[in-house]
Structure formats: C-alpha cells, structure tokens
C-alpha cells in the first residue's frame, strides 16, 4: 500500500492496524531513535531514546503528516481501540493515554525521529 493511500484511509476514518502503520513508516521513513516526552507538568512522561519506539515513530509520523489527535490515535490500532478504550481506568499504554489528555501540546522530541527516504 502506498503512503498516500494509507493516509487517505486514516483521514477517511477507516480502521488501520498498528502493524500496518509501522510497516508504512518503515517503508517510507528512516528512523533515528530519539528521546521524546508526552504530557504536561506532573503528568509528563519522558521516553528515553530507543524506548517506546512504536509510540515515537507513530507520533513523529503523525506530526510530519499533520494528522489530527483522533487520526493519530487510530494509528495505534487495537492498542488504542481495545486496550485503552476498553479499559478506561487502566494504566497500560501510558503514551496513548497521555496523548488522549494533552494532544499535540504535550508531544516534544529531542530531535527529528523520522526522515523521508
């Protein structure tokens, strides 16, 4: 699937999987592990370079492609739809939960994580 077709699916609110998202990113971008933070003030989660790489790639991809917060969350597939929405009081997938609360305002990268191939 092409990058343009994938982005059109996301923008049309069609269901995509985490695996599809990571595959599209890997096919179209070079990844550089980087530290990123997600959240604000006492709810800020700092992710060291090389940790939570799926989240790092997805947030960087969504930012580059100017996706809305809801479109960005859809990129996490079942981690968002089942694990987080299905367990609203849970503590798993904290990067997703923080993004739901703080959106793009809470996302900060130490450096650029993705570069187009």
Task: Walk through the language-model features, giving the residues of each.
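Short, charge-rich, low-complexity alpha-helical interaction segments
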Residues: 11-35, 111
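Intrinsically disordered, charged low-complexity linkers and terminal tails
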Residues: 3-7, 30, 55-58, 62
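Long, charge-rich, low-complexity intrinsically disordered regions
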Residues: 2-10, 113-116
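Amphipathic protein-protein interaction modules
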Residues: 43-92
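Long, compositionally biased
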Residues: 91-117
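A ubiquitous short alpha-helical element
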Residues: 6, 38-47
């Amino acid at each position: 699937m092409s990058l343009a077709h994938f982005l059109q699916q996301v923008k049309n609110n069609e269901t995509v999987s985490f695996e599809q998202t990571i595959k599209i990113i890997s096919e179209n971008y070079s990844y550089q592990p980087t530290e990123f933070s997600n959240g604000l003030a006492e709810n800020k989660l700092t992710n060291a370079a090389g940790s939570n790489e799926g989240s790092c790639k997805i947030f960087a991809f969504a930012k580059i492609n100017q996706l809305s917060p809801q479109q960005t969350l859809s990129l996490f597939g079942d981690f968002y739809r089942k694990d987080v929405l299905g367990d609203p009081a849970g503590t798993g997938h904290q990067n997703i939960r923080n993004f739901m609360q703080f959106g793009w305002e809470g996302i900060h990268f130490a450096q650029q994580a993705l570069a187009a191939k």
